Amino acid sequence: MNLSTQDAMPVAEPVVVARELKQVYKISRGFLHPADHLQAVSGVSFTVQPGKTLAVVGESGCGKSTLARMVSLIETPTSGELLLGGVDVVKASPQQRHALRRTVQLVFQNPFGSLNPRKKIGTILESPLEINTELDAKSRAEQARAMLALVGLRPEHFDRYPHMFSGGQRQRIAIARALMLKPALIVADEPVSALDVSIQAQVLNLLADLQQELGLAYLFISHDLGVVRHIAHDVLVMYLGHAIEQGEKKTIFAQPLHPYTQALLASTPGIVGAGAAKKRIVLTGELPSPLSPPGGCVFSTRCPHVVAKCHSERPPLRELSGRQVACHLAEQFIQPA
């Protein structure tokens, strides 16, 4: 059956649209010395749709947490466009930014550090409602108790303190608090890396269930591709502030085309795809300083396949084999189906 344009299902508006995002920090070198400039994020673009998860992966220092701080409105990008619900954050007024902050919430790596140890769980959950709404105390308590149940905790937990819970339970509380204002986007910065493996699976399943039930979008920051495999729909691989490969998870995991992505996947037990390395790839060379990144490809100092062109010419992020990749040699890694 053919459907006319009028009968077609409407396309949902993206929760987040980022175009050429940059974040540059001014680094003081002391008296009488000119300041250095550290480019933590260099022209990164991506989109996050409702009900979908974009995982941002890479080593420490790659810029993924800086990206999370920009999307969560903790920092303002130096340049580029960042649209939340169609509103450009960079150009937004203070009043608009205040309203946008309700639509984006954070879940941190260490749940114990993000929960006030002197307050009961009920008070912690009610706090966002007390600050941002005009609900009375009874309504706030009802919503907080309902949220506890939604994340799998019991009614008696309402009057307990954070130190009385396990790490997994504390992360459930942190997730519940993030959901109190009914956000469209959750920015999860390494939300399970501090938990035992068995507890990680429970929290990941909870996040997946909440996404399906509430239509949430996730920006999921992680260095663990084993975790990303279970939670993500799309993947953005970063290195030294640059996006070097991005696309659908199933496409990239089955056949990574950037040598850095190949090395990350090869170092993760249990991930096997058509293009996955048969043995671990050992990266040689030093991780460059972000204050003085290499010319040409940012990965050229550690790449096992480097050629002369890699040192002199920076590869653009281009469409290839169902994803975007920034590598001069990417075609040689494509394997026949």
Where are these regions (language model features)?
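ABC ATPase NBD coupling module
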Residues: 30-35, 89-105, 123, 131, ...
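Conserved ABC ATPase signature
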Residues: 161-165, 169
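P-loop NTP-binding/switch modules centered on Walker-like glycine-rich loops
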Residues: 187, 191-195, 199-278
